[in-house]
């Protein structure tokens, strides 16, 4: 058989303390989010349903506790009868339901992209006609965010295939990407743990998670990038657990494409590189460090190639863009929505710098230094700022899944049911459902991280497996 047990290098006392402290910190954070979420919720200003102005409202703790208990009972029953459940049937049903919900959501809403997705979509539409003028019309945006070159050309390719203004086909493709991403998570979990109870719980958690389904109408790199990065991790895991070297090529390719479509997934590449480096050191197979380097180099090279390709075809100078620390600085700023949220800082920074990346870097460092000095001068303000930043995001349990659909127009009027789900009584029911689901996740994360921390602190080094098997040639 190709599959082998994946083990980890021996953990020293320092390793166990460091990893245990990290797990303990995560447990504390999610326990706080759970406690906060039972009492309060972050919501968007009801006077401006399409806006992103965050308010903090008190919840009915009894209702939230009842919902949490209901979710726990549901999963307890599922795990109690899990031996009667055929995993293959459950997996197929979960993936089928996810795809069907995504397709239905896209077909009913027929949403038209706006804001960042709209800029990229309509610019791509003009490129299909050989007209690069939209690039110049959005010069500040694109020269601030040159990493959008990958998704821009992806959107152009799809419009060449499906036709200009093909919102629905791209949404349907998003539904397929989401379904495939769920499939990757299921496969990763099974290959990592081979535990039936865990697999049943994960499958139920995925099929009951409706927030990503609502994002199928959001024509951006989120869902395609998520799918590709998860399958890249799956291919990497197949190699690490004794698979042939042929799995390395799709792992690097898929990870590179994921980062091209959505640069945020460089986090996945960094995590994969770290795991591979630990594997190489623990197994004393230093050749695996080449794979580690590839996991970092391939996405960066692919992103660079995407930018060069767009510049070569259109003559539009993307440049280096805003420095990466721009988004760090933005996250330190007050704004009209909530502390640390998007506030056009990146665009105004590049305008101040007259689109010169070197000048932008200097200005950005000054802005960061100024905010750090303000935080240092008033620690209470700094604590309040980051607390509001955290709860405004993590206690808003729809994760903007409904908001992104409220702000988009449609090719046709919404049916009454959709209007209800987006802003009426159905919206309140759906929001309550999402809140109960998310609180259950926070409880699981807090308990899981806490138990892991205790195990790490209590165990001895020899209690951990010491050497992974080498991959097959």
Where does each model-flagged region fall?
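Start-transfer (signal-anchor) and selected internal transmembrane alpha helices
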Residues: 1-104, 288-296
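Membrane-interface anchor segments at the N-terminal boundary of transmembrane helices
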Residues: 50-66, 168-169, 173-174, 388-470
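Transmembrane-helix signature of polytopic, membrane-embedded enzymes
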Residues: 89, 185-208, 227, 460-467
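Extracytoplasmic catalytic/substrate-binding loops of multi-pass membrane glycan-assembly enzymes
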Residues: 109-123, 129-157, 161-165, 320, ...
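Loop-to-helix entry region of an early transmembrane alpha helix in multi-pass inner-membrane enzymes
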Residues: 145, 149, 153, 161-180, ...
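Transmembrane-helix motifs of polytopic, lipid-linked glycan transferases
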Residues: 172-193, 231, 447-450
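Short acidic/glycine- and proline-prone juxtamembrane loop motifs at membrane-interface regions
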Residues: 211-225
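Membrane-proximal stem/loop segments at transmembrane-domain junctions that anchor or position
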Residues: 308-413
């Amino acid at each position: 058989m190709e599959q082998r047990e994946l083990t980890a290098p021996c953990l020293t006392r320092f390793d166990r303390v460091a990893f245990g402290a990290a797990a303990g910190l995560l447990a504390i954070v999610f326990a706080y989010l759970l406690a906060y979420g039972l009492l309060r919720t972050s919501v968007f200003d009801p006077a401006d349903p399409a806006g992103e102005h965050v308010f903090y409202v008190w919840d009915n703790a009894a209702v939230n506790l009842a919902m949490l208990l209901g979710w726990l009972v549901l999963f307890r029953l599922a795990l109690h009868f899990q031996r009667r459940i055929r995993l293959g049937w459950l997996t197929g049903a979960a993936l089928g339901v996810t795809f069907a919900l995504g397709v239905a959501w896209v077909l009913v809403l027929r949403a038209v992209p706006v804001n960042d997705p709209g800029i990229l979509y309509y610019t791509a539409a003009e490129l299909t006609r050989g007209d690069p003028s939209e690039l110049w019309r959005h010069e500040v945006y694109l020269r601030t965010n040159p990493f959008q070159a990958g998704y821009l050309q992806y959107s152009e390719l799809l419009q060449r295939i499906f036709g200009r203004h093909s919102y629905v086909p791209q949404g349907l493709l998003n539904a397929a990407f989401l379904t495939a991403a769920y499939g990757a998570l299921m496969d990763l979990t099974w290959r990592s743990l081979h535990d039936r109870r865990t697999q049943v719980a994960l499958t139920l958690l995925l099929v009951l998670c409706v927030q990503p389904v609502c994002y199928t109408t959001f024509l951006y790199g989120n869902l395609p990038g998520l799918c590709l990065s998860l399958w890249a991790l799956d291919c990497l895991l197949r190699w690490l657990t004794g698979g042939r070297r042929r799995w390395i090529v799709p792992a690097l390719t898929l990870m590179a494409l994921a980062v091209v479509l959505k640069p945020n997934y460089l986090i996945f590449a960094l995590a994969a590189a770290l795991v591979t480096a630990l594997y190489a050191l623990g197994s004393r197979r230093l050749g695996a460090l080449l794979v580690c380097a590839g996991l970092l180099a391939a996405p960066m090279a692919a992103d660079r190639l995407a930018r060069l390709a767009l510049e070569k075809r259109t003559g539009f100078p993307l440049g280096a863009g805003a420095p990466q620390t721009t988004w760090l600085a933005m996250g330190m700023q007050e704004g009209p929505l909530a502390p640390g949220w998007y506030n056009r800082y990146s665009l105004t920074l590049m305008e101040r710098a007259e689109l010169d990346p070197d000048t932008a870097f200097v200005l950005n460092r000054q802005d960061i230094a100024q905010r750090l000095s303000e935080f240092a001068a008033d620690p209470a303000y700094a604590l309040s700022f980051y607390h509001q930043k955290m709860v405004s995001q993590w206690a808003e349990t729809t994760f903007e899944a409904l908001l992104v659909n409220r702000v988009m127009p449609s090719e046709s009027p919404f049916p009454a049911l959709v209007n209800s789900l987006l802003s009426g009584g159905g919206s309140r029911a759906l929001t309550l459902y999402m809140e109960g689901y998310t609180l259950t996740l926070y409880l699981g994360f807090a308990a899981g991280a806490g138990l892991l921390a205790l195990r790490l602190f209590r165990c001895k080094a020899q209690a951990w497996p010491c050497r992974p098997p080498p991959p097959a040639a």
